[in-house]
Amino acid sequence: MRPLVAGVTEAGITALPNLVQERLAKADCIIAATRFHADLPSHAKILNWPIPFSNIFNILEEHSKQSLVILATGDPMWFGAGATLVRQLGAEGCEVIPAVSGLQLAAARLGWPMANCRIASIHGRPLEQLRSVLSPRARVLVIAQDGASPKAVATALCDWGYGAADMHVLANLGGSQEARFSGTASHWQHDRMPDFHIIGIACDDAAPAIGPVAPDSRFENDGKLTKRDVRASALAKLAPFPQAVLWDIGTGSGAVSIDFLRAAPGGRAYGIDRNSVQLDRATANAGMHGVSGFEPVTGDLADSPNKVLDNLPVPDAVFVGGGVSVEVVTLAQARLRPGGVLVAHAVTIESESVLISAWQQTGGDLTRIAVQHADPVGGFHGWRPLMPVTQWTWLKGSGENDRCGA
């Protein structure tokens, strides 16, 4: 039998719609948070939420021939259990009936239009992920981990330059114990909150802005870094979009992957490098920027390309920032999905010759990027050039000679 995943609010079991009430009355097994157990039908087997939640699939298998109802907070398809179950079981594998979510209630209490709010979750996720949704004038709603979350968020906001942000904790939304606590991040006075709450953050006008391409100074690196001006061009060509998959070959500090993920919600970037120290650095940079979806992949494409790549999903985009060779370029072209884009950079004459040859043979767009910055020269200033970068962009299509921008 298909399990039912029903949303429930702090108003409790009695506030559930008639359809859900009827299903509860006939259920053989009900999974719900402990605070709802006393109001559930006594004839059914009552289970707590499984920890870890992945154990839910063992319960589903055990009760596959029985009527099973899962009560989840708010809208189960919005950062909830429903999304996980549908992803695993398929849309036909379970039935979902949503309730008003805590996020919606919080927005209503604060008078923030939902369409203008950014949503983040730190429930079972790193606190650093919050950083990716912060910017001047942003209105952010945060799904908390527990009662200690607001204090941790306030501390993090101060560390990140958002100490002037207004914070609102809306606890037990929709229930008889609903409460609201407010203050600035830099003067947050509340150490412990009720476990069920939503955090609202209102960033001030003077909050730091990063932009779509992060400054070089935000990346720990040993010099193997695609500089910001050049990275901006690469990102424009890679064209990130929600849930896009990037292969970042020769990932170095991970800067291209990180900026790609910042522009691709739900995306994944696979940083491929033979140097595990570089991958550790890239992973740390991803965490510092608050992006999820970065996966380090250790391996040498020159020695065992299939072993390195065979378990990775087909990429929508490939960036080659290091280790340019005929073999790597050919491999990237073959592995790209139809319609995908390949962007490769070269700074040496040898690697540039590889890109020129690839451009001559398979088309695309060949560009040379030369950047100069004003630097002191004695008591004056002059233009100090960076090494020019040759950039080759190639779109994979059905023809034998694909030309970008043709």
Name each model feature, range by range.
Residues 243-252:
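Conserved class I S-adenosyl-L-methionine
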Residues 2-7, 13-21, 66-68, 138-223:
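A contiguous loop/helix-start segment that scaffolds small-molecule binding in enzyme catalytic cores
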